[in-house]
């Protein structure tokens, strides 16, 4: 915006994030939450809210693709179960994990046991606690923290969660998790995917037809 000579107050940008980040995560969720490896890595990292540490539960597959996330004021079996339940919600049977790797926190074991009992997780799902297997998610935490650090603390859990939703969905797009739905390469394809999700610009069909016409015209 600054390069275009447009001055926008930081509070305006903050309000945009709070309004649109959760909506963007909701509208794009179907696109970036597809094609996971059946081996999931679960872990939590710390996020400061009003001067106190909260817990950001996160899951990635063994390739490092983002599966889901959940911000909680507590680190407990209840929070772990809520996070895992959220990650599993909406997945077909064949999309659910065959293996879950966690740290040695007892909360995960309790949550996994309850979800199996409730039929939300296959009873054959293996629970591992192999430290080096979580290197991939610990590295991913670090990349996310680079984005969070300039914020210098959040004022409330809802505002923190809204901002993190924006960070997570944009990182998922940059990882290429929605690439099959991007009709154009690179950032332009990601931008158009977001625009289509909000009903901005041509539809996917119109865009695809336009690209084909351009291709044939260039080849003529």
Predicted segments — roles?
Residues 1-40, 44-48, 78, 82-220:
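Charged, often Cys/His-bearing segments associated with DNA-binding zinc-finger transcription factors
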Residues 66-67, 97:
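Short, solvent-exposed beta-strand edge segments and adjacent coil->beta transition regions
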Residues 73:
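Short glycine-enriched, charge-decorated loop/helix-capping segments at active-site entrances
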Residues 50-66, 76, 84-88:
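Short conserved beta-strand segments at catalytic cores or DNA/RNA-binding microdomains
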């Amino acid at each position: 915006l600054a390069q275009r000579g447009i001055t926008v107050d930081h509070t305006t940008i903050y309000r945009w994030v709070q309004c649109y980040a959760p909506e963007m995560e909701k509208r794009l969720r179907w696109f970036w939450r597809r094609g996971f490896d059946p081996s999931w890595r679960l872990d939590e990292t710390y996020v400061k809210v009003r001067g106190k540490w909260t817990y950001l539960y996160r899951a990635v597959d063994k390739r490092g693709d983002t599966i889901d996330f959940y911000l909680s004021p507590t680190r407990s079996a209840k929070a772990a179960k809520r996070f895992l339940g959220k990650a599993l919600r909406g997945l077909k049977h064949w999309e659910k994990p065959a293996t879950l790797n966690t740290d040695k926190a007892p909360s995960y074991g309790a949550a996994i046991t309850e979800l199996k009992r409730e039929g939300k997780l296959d009873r054959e799902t293996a629970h591992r606690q192999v430290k080096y297997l979580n290197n991939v998610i610990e590295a991913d935490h670090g990349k996310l923290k680079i984005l969070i650090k300039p914020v210098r603390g959040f004022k409330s859990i809802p505002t923190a969660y809204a901002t993190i939703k924006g960070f997570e969905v944009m990182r998922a797009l940059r990882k290429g998790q929605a690439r099959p739905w991007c009709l154009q390469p690179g950032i332009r394809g990601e931008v158009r995917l977001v625009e289509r999700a909000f009903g901005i610009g041509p539809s996917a069909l119109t865009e695809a037809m336009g690209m084909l016409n351009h291709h044939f015209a260039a080849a003529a």
